[in-house]
Swiss-Prot record:
Region span, Domain III: 148-196
Keywords associated with the record: Cytoplasm, DNA damage, DNA recombination, DNA repair, DNA-binding
Gene3D superfamilies recorded: 5' to 3' exonuclease, C-terminal subdomain, DNA helicase RuvA subunit, C-terminal domain, Nucleic acid-binding proteins
Domain of life of the native organism: Bacteria
Name of the protein in its database record: Holliday junction branch migration complex subunit RuvA
GO biological process, one term: DNA recombination
GO CC aspect terms: cytoplasm; Holliday junction helicase complex; Holliday junction resolvase complex
Description of its domains: Has three domains with a flexible linker between the domains II and III and assumes an 'L' shape. Domain III is highly mobile and contacts RuvB.
Main location per the UniProt record: cytoplasm
Organism (species): Streptococcus agalactiae serotype Ia (strain ATCC 27591 / A909 / CDC SS700)
Family: Belongs to the RuvA family.
Functional note: The RuvA-RuvB-RuvC complex processes Holliday junction (HJ) DNA during genetic recombination and DNA repair, while the RuvA-RuvB complex plays an important role in the rescue of blocked DNA replication forks via replication fork reversal (RFR). RuvA specifically binds to HJ cruciform DNA, conferring on it an open structure. The RuvB hexamer acts as an ATP-dependent pump, pulling dsDNA into and through the RuvAB complex. HJ branch migration allows RuvC to scan DNA until it finds its consensus sequence, where it cleaves and resolves the cruciform DNA.
Amino acid sequence: MYDYIKGKLSKITAKFIVVETAGLGYVIYVANPYSFSGYVNQEVTIYLHQVIRDDAHLLFGFHTENEKEIFLNLISVSGIGPTTALAIIAVDDNEGLVSAIDNSDIKYLTKFPKIGKKTAQQMILDLSGKFVEASGESATSRKVSSEQNSNLEEAMEALLALGYKATELKKVKAFFEGTNETVEQYIKSSLKMLMK
């Protein structure tokens, strides 16, 4: 079982990235491959979950341990496999997902790929309260997280005003989720990624 991999990001495709370490290239399936586009040929650390099947050993990768924890919680629900869990992470900001589960918002959950009403109900039943328990978040840490997200949102709005497309910024935003930077730092780092 692998916890993480550290190596050079050598390739990006629509479904996976390749990280090279010790002369081997590892295919790693991630939610938003192009969110790594600013790090091609640079060293990266990717958190991992391995799925062993009869016909393949698959690696699923994540920007942060929190994103990995959300993935593990999702695949614990009957009817949600690794591919569906990645698709959910790819189209959501994670906060919306957690809020929908804790508030029993079936309508919100059924917007995700391959999630019908029955699976949404199962998600609520199995996962309500789990994300806070898993991360050990207190009211204070949630407040800090909210402030960090506010800085990121403000930076994304500034980049929109500069003429960048929402589709471009979604990939950039996904990369910076869970980080703690000032608005100016987010803008500077985002521009560096967007201009490559």
